[in-house]
Structures are given as structure tokens and as C-alpha cells.
Curated annotation (Swiss-Prot):
Alphabetical list of InterPro entries matching this protein: Rickettsia_antigen_120kDa (IPR020954)
Location within or outside the cell: Cytoplasm
Region annotation (Disordered) ranges: 1-73, 348-396
Source taxonomy: Bacteria, Pseudomonadati, Pseudomonadota, Alphaproteobacteria, Rickettsiales
Official protein name in the record: Antigenic heat-stable 120 kDa protein
Species of provenance: Rickettsia rhipicephali
Length: 1013
């Protein structure tokens, strides 16, 4: 395994050389140089008179002396067979990763950096030594194929060097197996004496085999491995017996305490070089990395992962620290044990021991530690670890006193809490405190000896301990409890329903704590709800939210704070990614419980109900649009059938319990969906027309006029904001207006279309175009509506006693009322005064009603096109035509006889097509009003003289009037005049109405206008 690389390797390999080297390595792996299948411990010693010390043997960068001129064959062999091939393979993988990097500028920068440095330094020592490049190195090392190559190179290299430079191969002072002897205590203790080549004793090594109660460590992939046996070697710190150098290379053991085969052997090597006094000094330690320890005590054994297997090294944590201190002293460096400890212990992101590079000159120095992320730390859990993001680690990220939670828990829960509290007291970095709490939570949930009930009890105790710990800041308490909750969430062994109970208990602890502020309590509550909503099945989620809600209601919080907490629960449910149906259920349950417990204020109830209504509306909208799409994309359905079905859906929406605003949103989605469909524009316009008609004709009792207008505006907004082209939207806008008029919608409904356009998010030019389309549709519809006013009279005799509409009904009533009066006057018998007076008044009232109805009808038409409705063409037309209308009315007034007036109507209002329809119709409206007003005045005026009656009626003789009966005489005069004027003016009104029918039929209906007598 190689986390670091020698900066001074001086050979670059061609592809052919690499292939040749790889073949040699494969051959080395297949060789059997000794009869033993197991790997042996080895050592190499030299006397004090040796020309140079033997360098260490390791695949780790910096462990080879940085003297490029060295002629030591072992050094060269290590460089050429281990270090440089590993570096070449690593650079090759880094370049592949850079080619796939999204940030192309950074990728190109790093590629150039590598290429330029290779020209100056083929070993790329600067690149590998730059902390800024760790993320690229780490990412490359994550590649499984590369890792296999590096491990293969390392194993083959060790084997080659040990065999080539062994005593058995004839190398003077070379490596030779350690002969353990003096077995004591049933083979638990062994020893060997190490001598230099002069036969002088350098030291005695003691080895102790420890057969322990199995403990568990985790591999990088999260799987657990039990260690049942390991050994400890008492590596010497000071050597003062004899002169010379010594290199001890001890094979790493498998998890069961046995030695691996030679082709898989890896070693822990201690390098003792001759010091100034000739005595060996510990100058360097070489081992595969990252090195980890199975605990925090000095007796914790070291272990590594290599080739997917766990191996223990013959050194404890205490011995390793002692050796490291000696290495740094002998290198002339000060020792920072806290820093060394930081690097030794791997928790969270992996960290390794500092790399101590022995120098061959007096000016030697310690190379800066280099880090990598490769093998995860010890963990007592079988939970798969999530891969860490490649990044440049910080030297202070690791907690040197991180708890071995599994070991602590093996005693009792109180032991675990004691360890946790001790760590929290000692550690001031909140991030490390949280790591400690999370590690403890993991140990609790993965303790194989505990049942579910015990795990629940212990996890709750840990949460309570976190909340009440005085060494944690409020924010750290929040983060600590959240870490416990996150551990519960990620645990794969605890059933979700059991998790929901843990969540409820955690909420109860946090809310009832006197050591937290409301803000912190709410933050913990929200995290708990998040975890509850993340459970896998709906039953567990419902149980979690119900439990949390109950915990809030039963807590010792004030009623106001309880309401606030329930609102927080509801908000979390509301913004979750669950289905609307499940949201309805969960939020409805929270609301129901809150109302029943009387902890929600009216305002809070209203807010939660509004959120519930929105969820309901969203679900309704979703369901509705699905139905609409099914209808639109039905290939066997005609446009007429599509329209009918979508009208039915629209009607159901309008009849629903939602608010008008929500109904508007749904209708907007309907029209938007129709507009965005692939149907022909004319078909879409027909469907939209049906929607408009359905809204306009909907019952006023269930949907008020303002709400209809609001919904109609939404319908138009759905059209105008669709992605279809502008001409199609214009056509659909016209269709919507047509639907309004088909449904007899009033001016407010029509104006709402303009409001929908104004409130849309389209640009101004499109808004103007759509308003023009709406106004054009309104004008065309007005013509149709005006003609419909007389539709009931077409083809009918005015004298027939049949139902009439509006003005024509009243006109017929006048005729029916006046005829008996005329007939009575023409008979010789005297009329009854009271009856005549009554008829006069009724006639006057009817005529007034005619006038009012005419004015009202015309004003209604005008209101549809008024300036408030944004129908600007009406204003322009009024400005242009008002003068012409006045001229025509004035000219009509100059005609004294009925015949002249009828001729004027025909010539100027029917035949003269140079005048606009608008001008002619307005003239007729005004003349009708004048005629009705004139007759009303005639009926009510009692001072008209007999001769006026005779002149007007065409009589040539004056009849004497009895002075004895003045009342009758007066009645005769008034009624006589009234009779004449009404009869003639009714003829004029009939002519005006015929003219209007004719004008209206010019573009709408070519049938012959009805002639009125």
C-alpha cells in the first residue's frame, strides 16, 4: 500500500519497460524461493565499520534516503521495483481522472503541471509533496484496479528485495529469518538475540502472543472483521550494547494471528542506523499505511487493511508513540506528541502517522507529513460506510482521544457514558465532540448483545446525556442530538416502527429539558420530524409523526410554545416530498390532535387548515389535469366530445369545496393544459369556449359573480401563459369570450378576461395583441346579442297575444291597453271617468317602463365595451360618431308627418350604407328614447285643447263641449290627443325597430327584417 512516494526516484519508464516490469513482478509472485509457505520475520545488521548504513525497505515515499547519488543496491532495488512503478501507475490514473473532470480549466492546469514537472524532475516529487494535490491522489487511490496494482507491486517488491538481498542468497550482512527461541508460558512469550556481523549482541527482542476476546474492526467497505489473536514485539528504543546498524522487518499477521503466505506478506520495519557514538539509533519506521489502532489506550494494537484483508502489526499504540518520539529526536527534530497522536489515530477521515525521512547528512530534516483518505477508521458497527468526498484533509480534523465506543459498551452503558463525558470534557472542538457522540450512538445500535428494548433505552440515555452535558455549547447540543438522530436514520438493523419510538422519546427529552432554549428545542424537533418522514413505509412515518405530536402535547412547554412546535411539525410535513395524499393524512392528524388538546390558537388552526387546503388543492389539481390529459389525448374522441367532458370536469371543480382562489388555480391549469396540447388551434378554441360557457352559466348561489370573474381571469391567464404561439392564444381568447356570451355572462365576467391578460407574466406587446383579440370578440358578440333582442318577434304578428321580450313585450302591452280606450271613445256611450283615468296612468307607466328598459338594454351593451373593460375602439367610435348621431336626430325632428319620418328612417338608417352600423344603431336608440319620452309627456299633460286634438287627428268639425261635465270633457281631450299621438308614434317605433333589425342582419342574418305596424 502506498500513500506516499519517494520524491527522488530517478527513472522514467517507457510503456515497453512497464510491461516488462509487470511481467517480472508476476513471475516474482509465482516464485517459491524457500520451502516455507509462511512469511518470516527478518533482520539485517552491519558492523560499525560498515561503509554505509542500509536504508529502509518500504513502498512508502520518503522512507528512502533522499540522496540521489547513493550507490546502495538495496536502495536502488526498492526505488526501481516498488516506488517508481507505483508512482507511474498512480500518475496514469490521475491523468485519466483529470480527463473526466468537469472543471476543464483545473484539469488542464494540473495536466500541464504534471507534464512540466516531469521534464525537470521525473520523480514528480513536488507534485506528490504538494498538499493541494492530495485530492487528486486520493481520488486515484480509490480506483480498485489501481489499488490492486499498487498492492501487487508492493508485495512483489518486498519479496524480491528480501530474497535478492538475503543472507541465503549470499548477500553479506543480508536479511535473514528471525529465530525465535526460549519459549515461555505455553508459547505466549518468545525471544531472540540480535547480533551484528561481528557477533556482538545488539539487543534482545521479546515477542508476546495475545489471545484476546474477539473484537471487531471495519474494513473500507464497511464489513466487519474479528481479531482474535495478535502479537506484540518490544522494539528497543535505546541501543547501547554494541556498534553497528540494525533493520528489523516484522511480518504483519492475519486477523486470526497466523502468518500470511509469502506472496501476500507485508512488513513493519524499524531502521536503526549507526549514530555518532557508533551505537544504533532508531532513525525511521516503515509500514504500509494508513496505520490504525484498535482503541485509545497505550495497549491498543496496530492494524492495517491491505488487499481487502485486515492485518495486525506487532506494535502497540504506546510503543509506536515511544518509537516515533525517538525517531524525531534522532532526526534532530522537536517532538509534538499531540500532533503525532492526531495523525496516528484514524477516526472520521483517515489520517496517518507522520512520515519520517532519515537523512544521510548532518543537515537532515523531517519531511512534512502527507495524508491520504484510503481506509476507514475502526468502527464497532457493521453499517456500510459512505464513501468520503475527495478533498484536501486538514491536519487538525482528527480527535486523538476519540472513544472506542464498542469497547466501552462491552462493560455497561454507564461505562460508555463515562467515556463519552470524559471525551467531551477534554475535547473543545465541537466537531470532534459530535463525532464522539455519533460513534457512541453507532456502537449502541450495533451492539449484537442488546435487544431492541435495550437499544432504545440506551440511545435515549445517550440523547439525554448529550442534552444535559455542561461541556457542550447549545449549538453543539443541537448538533449532537442531530447526530444521534442521523445515526438512528441510517441504521439498517432497527425496524422503522422501533425507530419511531426512539424519535418520540428523543423529542420528549429535548422538549422537557431545562438546559435548552426554545430555539434549540425547535431545531431538534425539526430534525426529528425529518428523520421520521424519511422512514421507509407510510405506517412507520405515520407512527413517527403521531408519536412526535403526542410528545409535544404532553411536554411541559407552555400552551403557546406547544402550538409553535406543532406548527413546526406541520411545516415540515408540508414541505416534504411525500405524496399529497400522505401529506393530507399526516397534517390532518397533527391538526386534529392539536385542536382536541386545545394547544393551537385560532390563527394557528387557520394557518394549518390553509396548508391542508393547499395540499388538497394540489392533489385535486394533479388528478384533474390527469383526467384532462386523458381526454385530450384520446384518439377516438371528437372535439365535441372532448369539450363536453372537459366542461363536466370544469363544473365539478366549480362545485367543489375549495376556495375561489384554488378553483381558479385549477381552472387555470385546465386551460393551460388545453392550450399546450397538440390539438388544432380551432379545436382548442372550441374546448376553451366550452370552459368559458360553463363558468358563466354556473349557479350564482354556489358561485358569486365576483368569484366567477376571478375564476374567469384565471382561465384566461392559463391560456395566455401557455407556450403555444400567439395566433393560437388569440383564437382561444376569442373562444373564451364567445363562451361567456353563450352563457349570458355579464360585463363583469367579460372584463375579467382583460384582468387575466393584465396579470399574466407575458410581455406587453403580447398583452396588447390579446386584448385586441378579446375586444374584437366582444364587438362581434355584441352584434349577435343585440339581434337576439328581437329574435322572439321574427315571423310573428305584433298583434298576436304571445310572449314577447323586453321592449317589444311592453310595446304590445301599450297597444293592448290603448285599443280599448280608442274603441270606447268612438262609441256613443259616455266613458267612465275613473276607468279612463286609470288607463291613462297605466299607459303612462308602461311607456315609462319601455323607456327605462330600452335605456337599460343599451347601457348594458355599452358597459360590455366600456373603457373599464379596456375596449378602446368604443371611445374612438363615440368620438367620431357622436356628432353624426346628433345631426341625424336633429334632421329627423324636422320631419312633421309620420310619412316623412318613415321615409327618413329608410333613406338614412337602412339604405345609407356609408354610415357605420354603430352610428345608425345609436341614432335608432336615441330616437326610440325620444319617442317614448314624448308619448309619456303627452299622456300626462291635461291642458291640451280640443282644436289641437282635431287638428292632429285630422277632424274638420268642432263638436260642442258640455260645460256641465268638465271632467268628462277634460278626459275626452286628453285621451283623444293621447290616442292620436300613441298610435302614430307606435308606427314610428315600429319603423325604427324594423330598421334596427335590418342593420343587425347585414352581417349576421340575411333574412328579411320583421315589419312592425
Amino acid at each position: 500500500d502506498t500513500s506516499e512516494f519517494d520524491p527522488l526516484a530517478n527513472k522514467e519508464y517507457t510503456e515497453e519497460q512497464k510491461q516488462k516490469l509487470e511481467q517480472e513482478q508476476k513471475e516474482l509472485l509465482s516464485q517459491t524461493t524457500t520451502p516455507e509457505l509462511e512469511a518470516d520475520d527478518g533482520f539485517i545488521v552491519t558492523s560499525a565499520s560498515s561503509a554505509q548504513s542500509t536504508p529502509s525497505i518500504s513502498a512508502l515515499s520518503g522512507n528512502i534516503s533522499p540522496d540521489s547519488q547513493t550507490s546502495d543496491p538495496i536502495t536502488k532495488a526498492v526505488r526501481e521495483t516498488i516506488i517508481q512503478p507505483q508512482k507511474d501507475n498512480l500518475i496514469e490514473q490521475i491523468l485519466k481522472d483529470l480527463a473526466a473532470l468537469t472543471d476543464r480549466d483545473l484539469a488542464e492546469q494540473k495536466r500541464k503541471e504534471i507534464e512540466e514537472e516531469k521534464e525537470k524532475d521525473k520523480t514528480l516529487s513536488t507534485f506528490f509533496g504538494n498538499p493541494a494535490n492530495r485530492e487528486f491522489i486520493d481520488k486515484a487511490l480509490e480506483n480498485p484496479e489501481l489499488k490492486k496494482k499498487l498492492e501487487s507491486i508492493e508485495i512483489a517488491g518486498y519479496k524480491n528485495v528480501h530474497n535478492t538481498f538475503s543472507t541465503a542468497s549470499g548477500y553479506p550482512g543480508g536479511f535473514k529469518p528471525v529465530q525465535w527461541e526460549n519459549q515461555v508460558s505455553a508459547s505466549d512469550l518468545r525471544a531472540t538475540v540480535v547480533k551484528n556481523d561481528a557477533g556482538d549482541e545488539l539487543c534482545t527482542l521479546n515477542e508476546t502472543t495475545v489471545k484476546t476476546k474477539p473484537f471487531t474492526v471495519a474494513k473500507q467497505d464497511g464489513t466487519q472483521v474479528q481479531i482474535s489473536s495478535y502479537r506484540e514485539i518490544d522494539f528497543p528504543i535505546k541501543l547501547d550494547k554494541a556498534d553497528g546498524s540494525m533493520h528489523l522487518s516484522m511480518v504483519a499477521l492475519k486477523a486470526d494471528g497466523t502468518k500470511p503466505s509469502k506472496d501476500k506478506a507485508i512488513y513493519f520495519t524499524a531502521h536503526y542506523e549507526e549514530g555518532p557514538n557508533g551505537k544504533p539509533q532508531l532513525k525511521e519506521i516503515s509500514s504500509p499505511k494508513p496505520l490504525k489502532f484498535a482503541g485509545t489506550g497505550d495497549d491498543a494494537i496496530a492494524y492495517i487493511e491491505h488487499g481487502g484483508e485486515i492485518y495486525t502489526l506487532a506494535v502497540t499504540r504506546g510503543k509506536y508513540k515511544e518509537m516515533m518520539k525517538e525517531v524525531e529526536l534522532n532526526q534532530g527534530q522537536s517532538v509534538d506528541l499531540s500532533q503525532a497522536e492526531d495523525i496516528i489515530i484514524g477516526q472520521g477521515q483517515s489520517k496517518e502517522q507522520p512520515l519520517i525521512t532519515p537523512q544521510q547528512t548532518a543537515s537532515s530534516s523531517v519531511e512534512s507529513p502527507q495524508y491520504k483518505q484510503q481506509v476507514p477508521p475502526i468502527t464497532p458497527t457493521n453499517q456500510p460506510l459512505q464513501p468520503e468526498t475527495s478533498q484536501m484533509p486538514q491536519s487538525q480534523q482528527v480527535n486523538p482521544n476519540l472513544l472506542n465506543a464498542a469497547t466501552a459498551l462491552s462493560g455497561s452503558m454507564q461505562d460508555l457514558l463515562n467515556y463519552v463525558n470524559a471525551g467531551l470534557t477534554k475535547e473543545i472542538d465541537s466537531n470532534k465532540q459530535i463525532d464522539l457522540i455519533k460513534e457512541a450512538a453507532t456502537a449502541i445500535l450495533h451492539n449484537a448483545k442488546s435487544d431492541i428494548a435495550e437499544k432504545q433505552t440506551n440511545i435515549i440515555a445517550l440523547a439525554e446525556n448529550t442534552v444535559n452535558n455542561q461541556n457542550l455549547t447549545p449549538d453543539a447540543k443541537v448538533a449532537g442530538v442531530n447526530a444521534v438522530l442521523e445515526t438512528i436514520k441510517n441504521d439498517q438493523n432497527t425496524p422503522d416502527l422501533e425507530k419511531s419510538k426512539m424519535l418520540e422519546a428523543t423529542v420528549a427529552i429535548t422538549l422537557n429539558s431545562e438546559n435548552l432554549e426554545p430555539k434549540q428545542k425547535e431545531q431538534m424537533l425539526e430534525k426529528t420530524v425529518d428523520v421520521g418522514l424519511s422512514l421507509k413505509d407510510d405506517a412507520s412515518r405515520a407512527a413517527a409523526i403521531d408519536g412526535i405530536t403526542d410528545a409535544v402535547i404532553k411536554s411541559n412547554l407552555s400552551t403557546e410554545d406547544k402550538g409553535t412546535m406543532l406548527i413546526a411539525v406541520g411545516d415540515k410535513v408540508n414541505v416534504s416530498e411525500l405524496s399529497n395524499a400522505e401529506k393530507q393524512k399526516l397534517l390532518g392528524s397533527v391538526l386534529k390532535k392539536g385542536v382536541e388538546a386545545q394547544v393551537l390558537s385560532p390563527a394557528q388552526q387557520q394557518l394549518m387548515q390553509q396548508n391542508l387546503d393547499k395540499i388538497t388543492a394540489e392533489q385535486t389539481k394533479k388528478d384533474t389535469i390527469k383526467k384532462v390529459n386523458d381526454i385530450l389525448f384520446d384518439p377516438l374522441s371528437s372535439t365535441e366530445l372532448k369539450t363536453t367532458n372537459i366542461q363536466a370536469i370544469t363544473s365539478n371543480v366549480l362545485d367543489g369545496p375549495a376556495t375561489a382562489e384554488v378553483k381558479g388555480e385549477i381552472i387555470q391549469e385546465i386551460t393551460n393544459t388545453v392550450a399546450g396540447s397538440s390539438l388544432e388551434a380551432q379545436d382548442k378554441a372550441e374546448i376553451v369556449k366550452g370552459v368559458g360557457e360553463t363558468i358563466a352559466t354556473h349557479s350564482d348561489t354556489s358561485l358569486s359573480l365576483p368569484n366567477k370573474a376571478l375564476i374567469m381571469a384565471s382561465a384566461e391567464k392559463g391560456i395566455v401563459e401557455s407556450k403555444t404561439n400567439l395566433p393560437d392564444r388569440e383564437l382561444m381568447t376569442k373562444g373564451l369570450v364567445d363562451g361567456i356570451y353563450e352563457g349570458k355572462g355579464g360585463p363583469e365576467i367579460t372584463k375579467a378576461v382583460s384582468s387575466g391578460i393584465d396579470n399574466s407574466n407575458i410581455n406587453d406587446s403580447e398583452k396588447e395583441a390579446l386584448k385586441k383579440a378579446k375586444d374584437a370578440a366582444s364587438e362581434a358578440t355584441l352584434d349577435i346579442e343585440t339581434q337576439n333582442l328581437t329574435e322572439g318577434l321574427k315571423g310573428q304578428n305584433i298583434e298576436e297575444h304571445k310572449p314577447r321580450d323586453d321592449i317589444y313585450n311592453k310595446a304590445q302591452e301599450v297597444i293592448n291597453a290603448v285599443n280599448p280606450v280608442i274603441e270606447a271613445l268612438e262609441k256613443p256611450k259616455a266613458p267612465v271617468v275613473s276607468a279612463e283615468e286609470r288607463i291613462v296612468q297605466e299607459t303612462s307607466s308602461i311607456l315609462n317602463n319601455i323607456s327605462k328598459l330600452a335605456v337599460e338594454k343599451v347601457n348594458n351593451f355599452r358597459a360590455m365595451l366600456s373603457s373599464n373593460g379596456n375596449f378602446k375602439t368604443l371611445e374612438k367610435k363615440k368620438e367620431e360618431s357622436i356628432k353624426k348621431v346628433d345631426e341625424l336626430v336633429k334632421a329627423f325632428g324636422t320631419k312633421s308627418s309620420t310619412e316623412e319620418q318613415q321615409s327618413f328612417i329608410k333613406a338614412n338608417l337602412i339604405d345609407d350604407k356609408t354610415l357605420s352600423k354603430e352610428v345608425r344603431l345609436q341614432t335608432i336608440d336615441k330616437l326610440l328614447q325620444e319617442q317614448t319620452q314624448k308619448q309619456a309627456e303627452a299622456i300626462e299633460n291635461p291642458s291640451v285643447k280640443t282644436e289641437d286634438v282635431r287638428v292632429v287627428s285630422g277632424k274638420s268639425e268642432l263638436k260642442p263641449i258640455s260645460k256641465d261635465t268638465p271632467d268628462i270633457e277634460k278626459a275626452k281631450m286628453v285621451v283623444g290627443r293621447d290616442r292620436v299621438n300613441i298610435k302614430e308614434n307606435i308606427k314610428i317605433m315600429g319603423a325604427l325597430m324594423n330598421a334596427r333589425d335590418s342593420i343587425q342582419s347585414e352581417n349576421v342574418n340575411k333574412s328579411t327584417p320583421i315589419k312592425r305596424e
